[in-house]
Amino acid sequence: MSVRLQTTTLWYHPSQQHDPERVFGNPRYEGRTPSYVIWNLLERYTREGDLVVDPFCGGGTSIDVAAHLGREGRGFDIAPSRDDIQQADARSLPLEDDSADFVFMDPPYSTHIEYSDHPDCIGKLDAFEAEYLDAMDGAFAEAQRVLKDRRYLAVYVSDTFKKKRGFIGLGAELYVLLKRRFRPVDHVAVVRGNRKLEKPRFHKTAAEDNFFLRGFNHLLIFKQERGERAR
């Protein structure tokens, strides 16, 4: 597979890994971020030696890609899965103001995955409740604090649907929160390479019960512009 920069706002990653000769992130970590997405972001918005920060580091894909590209990756998680990921709440990072050159976030999309038993885990908050959005706004405020002026932030998130509760457009909800703090750059749809989407029984259930399977993730790209009102 020849890896290349995406040039439209519709991305498709044919594999979890952008480099078939390497493994980026813990392959056993549920809900891990495709390295292809992070590679595209870092190639566009960072330079060699830049500090890349991931407050929801999970399986460590972001810091592995950062290291491969010659960037300094610092990963944080409420429940670290690796020794090179530091324990911290995304709402309170042990970083100085204006220290990060790029911030990447792949936060929990509600309670679909059991991430940890930590009482402060945002993954325990139901996205249908106000507490989830309050927590995410706290994480965005912290990103605003640590991100340098004129540098970029990207948030990778999926909408959510639950039977008997309905649909919540997390991409739209988080966009509104981010726009209060940063300047919008672009909004990319990333086609989900999910094996469940290849199974006929899931499509049969979706058709019979009249709902849609999540076919893409939102990639929300913003820029820090201190002293200028986001617009």
Task: Briefly describe each language-model feature range.
Residues 1-231:
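Class I S-adenosyl-L-methionine-dependent methyltransferase catalytic core
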